[in-house]
Amino acid sequence: MKQQSKLGPSVGRASQSRDPGSLCPATERYGFRPAPGGLALVREFLNTRTSAQHGPDLLGDGARAQSWAAHVAPAWSALRGTNISPPTLTNHDAARLRDLRDTLDGLLTGHVVGQRHVVGAVELALDDRGDICTMPTGHGWRWFSSAIWSEVLLSQHAGTWQRLKQCRNPACRSTFYDRSWNNSAVWDNARTCGPQMTNQGANLLGI
């Protein structure tokens, strides 16, 4: 049976009683607050990558991906006011999710997409209040792809997508949500990553 979940209204309204932090085991490795609403899922997904400072790839194989999904899928669906079981993920699913993660990484770092192409599919439905909702489709990695691209779409319409960034410190590379008033941050933590990069530059110059 197809697993479905209401993503929420087209304006991206999340359940007001839910905390997006509960769906962020990967992001919590960095010690940061989650991104607002459903965008927390996208940031969380990107922060599953290997980090020399914070741990292994949480999508490294099917078992790791399944463990990650067991936390994230129910928490995300609760954030959106519904209830689902996490999709089953195999080694193949984990590999496809890593490919998807690379694609999203490219978008954040300015990779040119090129010709328009299909990246996923969702279903539209009316909820009990008459709001249009998007519903992830597919099984395994396709379910996550559908949910993640839906959240990207909602954040682009809400004007928050441009605040999702990748730290410029190569040793960190975490995905962070820029909360600065002018959206000018380039480090996830200006107190640690900023000085590290400044010191590296000084060493290269022999200062």
Regions found by a protein language model. Give the residues of each.
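Short helix-coil boundary/hinge micro-motifs
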Residues: 1-177, 206
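Short metal-binding segments enriched for Cys and/or His
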Residues: 195-207
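C-terminal structured interaction module
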Residues: 180-182, 200-201
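Cysteine-rich micro-motifs
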Residues: 183-195
